[in-house]
Amino acid sequence: MRFGLDLSQHQLTWDEMVSRAHLAEEAGLDGVWAFDHFTALYGDPGGPSLEAWTLLAGLARETSRVRLGTMVTGMTHRHPAVLAAEVVTVDHLSGGRAECAIGAAWNEEEHRELGIPFPPVAERMDRLEEGVQVLRRLFTEDDVTFEGRHVRLEHATYRPRPVQQPHPPIWVGGTGRRRTLPIAGRHADVWHGWADDAMELAAMNAIIDGAAEEAGRDPAQILRASSLSISEPWDEVRSAFDWMAGERIGYLMIEWPSEGRARLEEFLEQVLPTLG
């Protein structure tokens, strides 16, 4: 099992972000992850919310080992060609530590406030599936022409190539059984989702497996990821870890606890070594 840390950057300063990233690195965690939202989701909506990919670019120079990604970037937020350039830039600034995690986007209020179009769910899912294909091709190919319903490229080339070859891992986040999970099965290197229990998680994994097989992919090659709350009593945290690990989760995002840093440090020092 690999563990990442949700930085939860809303309402916080750059210095606090650096401190949290250093904590993750010193604890031996695999990665640090930022929200990709332009307004604060929690607390004062007018409070600070550092932009995710710029934040990761800065953290790339403040860290040496942890991997860097968003959880997740909505495909309505940026044209996929722009996102590809941002991911590759962070990959170079970090020496090959970028993760590319995308979703369909969900926060209608944020879109409305900022004047970002928020299409119906069917179109957002179409954009997600087109976007993941465009990203992979721009990471690996020259002279890319793509004719989708919503995304079009004409003889596009982006350089430099990523440090990671063939490309940074592409994550698809979400739990929608009709569209999101099949998209993950067809295209993702990693799927991130959440469930209330092992039975629900097993059902979602089965959908991903089926879509992967139909696309000629080996389902075992798709890493399964989820998130772990550490605000509950430790026996409940251990129980959640056990049933998620039992259903093929291989990466867990540690949610920054509302109780603060001391709770996280207790988990890292006393609980994490006992898991698995």
Feature map (PLM): residue ranges:
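Active-site-adjacent structural elements that line small-molecule/cofactor binding pockets in enzymes
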Residues: 1-276
